[in-house]
């Protein structure tokens, strides 16, 4: 959802705009959310962005939610005037209240510790997790979902996106062998960059319109990339499994295979990096329009492109089979295609990722 309140880039046209104030009112940052006028403003701001799509259009489709920067009512930005993350107390209130009202927490899982950050909170049932979840399909497949904003730190070389206990859980599950397939699904995509501040990578958009690390990215933390490399190493080290990471965020449909991650040579066991596609993006919301560059492999990664990033509405279907993961990619062009075509769309690309061994 989009209702940025303080971010220099987005707030003027989103949550701090005159139109937003007319539609929903203004938040009081020193007040609670529930039981105050803040709750009214929240419902007016969030409800129309969530309910018609996920409560109506997807009413017969199970949907699981990961929060990212805008779900905390800010864009990830860092300047000398403001650094929007880690989330402030009020940002946390809004994000938690939105989840409480509109979409579910993750159910308990026997393999996920109940004491991870933002799990078993005092105002939630024991074992419910707000930011780190598991989708489990018997012994066939497990998908690990994790929010990189809730616990991020600004500690230089030791900074993290994901609390170290959460990282320990992710790596333990990746090393375990009790499911045929295991997929990582973080809220910020490994393998791809648009030069934003709150990404895994240090790349920025250079004057030539390309990503570069020759210019510093202010307030970016080296520890974020170190954690990324630890997670990618754990995926690459899996035996008899397809190393696959799926994310959204960058408003594109894409697939590539990581052949190098920093100093880690992955040519013998590439990691498939998928951008699953956006189901809805406003005309000015595509990265190439907003930032001057679309989803692009960062300099830290050598990526063999199989599906070059496409900035259109779409989605990805993954079929988990005992011996493979089969991916089908779908796209729909708002500018040239009628909505009736969505019901009969065929994949524009499909790929089979066989298990190792």
Locations of regions flagged by a protein language model:
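Metal-dependent phosphoester/phosphodiester hydrolase catalytic core
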Residues: 1-357
């Amino acid at each position: 959802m989009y209702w940025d309140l303080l971010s220099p880039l987005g707030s003027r046209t989103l949550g701090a705009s005159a139109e937003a104030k007319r539609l929903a009112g203004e938040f009081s940052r020193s007040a609670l959310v529930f039981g105050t006028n803040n709750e009214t403003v929240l419902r007016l701001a969030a409800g129309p962005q969530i309910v018609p799509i996920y409560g109506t259009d997807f009413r017969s489709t199970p949907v699981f939610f990961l929060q990212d920067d805008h779900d905390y009512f800010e864009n990830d930005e860092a300047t000398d005037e403001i650094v929007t993350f880690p989330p402030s107390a009020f940002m946390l209130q809004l994000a938690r209240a939105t989840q409480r009202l509109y979409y579910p927490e993750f159910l308990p899982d026997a393999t996920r510790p109940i004491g991870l950050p933002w799990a078993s909170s005092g105002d939630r049932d024991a074992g419910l997790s707000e930011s780190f979840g598991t989708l489990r399909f018997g012994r066939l497949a497990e998908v690990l979902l994790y929010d990189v904003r809730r616990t991020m730190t600004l500690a230089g070389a030791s900074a993290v996106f994901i609390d170290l206990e959460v990282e320990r859980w992710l790596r333990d599950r990746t090393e375990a062998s009790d499911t045929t397939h295991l997929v990582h699904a973080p809220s910020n995509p490994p393998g791809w960059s648009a030069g934003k501040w709150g990404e895994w990578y240090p790349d920025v958009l250079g004057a030539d319109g390309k990503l570069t690390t020759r210019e510093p990215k202010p307030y970016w933390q080296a520890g974020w990339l170190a954690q990324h490399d630890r997670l990618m190493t754990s995926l690459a080290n899996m035996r008899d499994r397809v190393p696959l990471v799926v994310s959204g965020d960058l408003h594109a449909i894409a697939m590539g295979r990581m052949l190098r991650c920093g100093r880690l040579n992955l040519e013998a066991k590439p990691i498939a990096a998928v951008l699953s596609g956006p189901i809805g993006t406003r005309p000015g919301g595509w990265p190439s329009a907003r930032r001057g560059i679309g989803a692009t492999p960062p300099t830290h990664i050598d990526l063999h492109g199989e599906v070059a990033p496409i900035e259109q509405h779409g989605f990805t279907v993954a079929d988990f089979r005992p011996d493979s993961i089969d991916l089908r990619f779908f796209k729909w062009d708002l500018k040239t295609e009628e909505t009736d075509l969505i019901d009969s769309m065929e994949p524009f690309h499909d790929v089979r990722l066989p298990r190792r061994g």
